[in-house]
């Protein structure tokens, strides 16, 4: 919450969505977003989130790393963003339907040491790049357990707050 709290204190409008408390399905692979309309055809709690991202200047995704990847909830969200891609996205210089100029932040925590799960940030940085989030950053807290103290978390909080000042300062 450090990024959002700092951004809000700087005057930015912040919308926070807790995916775990939402009722939504993962991508159905129906391709309706490529053949019938320019958005996901499913209508559920995630619809508002997917629409809000079109208006947002910054997309922040945060997740613990569980079993070698982001949480299932965030992965299901990522899958649903397939609807942002144009039908012929592999053959285009502008594969994504999102407006240009957005920034992306991925915040990951993991109990494992730094050397573990190194592929996770790379995978989702590529995702952000593919979606046109050219100004992007990952904050990765390795060795952070539920019992981590405020002192343990301080470097990551400071990094998030500094990035909020850089991206959202007026």
Predicted segments with their positions:
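Hydrophobic anchor at the start of a short beta-strand
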Residues: 14, 135-136
């Amino acid at each position: 919450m450090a990024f959002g709290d700092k951004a809000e204190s700087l005057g930015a409008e912040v919308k926070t969505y807790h995916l775990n408390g939402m009722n939504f399905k993962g991508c159905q692979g129906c391709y309706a977003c490529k053949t019938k309309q320019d958005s996901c055809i499913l209508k559920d709690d995630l619809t508002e989130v997917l629409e809000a991202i079109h208006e947002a200047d910054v997309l922040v995704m945060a997740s613990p790393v569980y079993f070698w990847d982001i949480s299932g909830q965030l992965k299901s969200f990522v899958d649903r963003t397939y609807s942002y891609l144009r039908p012929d996205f592999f053959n285009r210089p502008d594969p994504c339907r999102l407006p240009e100029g957005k920034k992306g932040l991925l915040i990951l925590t993991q109990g494992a040491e730094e050397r573990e799960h190194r592929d996770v940030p790379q995978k989702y940085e590529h995702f952000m790049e593919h979606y046109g989030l050219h100004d992007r950053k990952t904050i990765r807290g390795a060795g952070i357990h539920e019992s981590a103290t405020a002192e343990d978390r301080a470097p990551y909080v400071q990094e998030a707050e500094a990035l909020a000042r850089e991206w959202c300062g007026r």
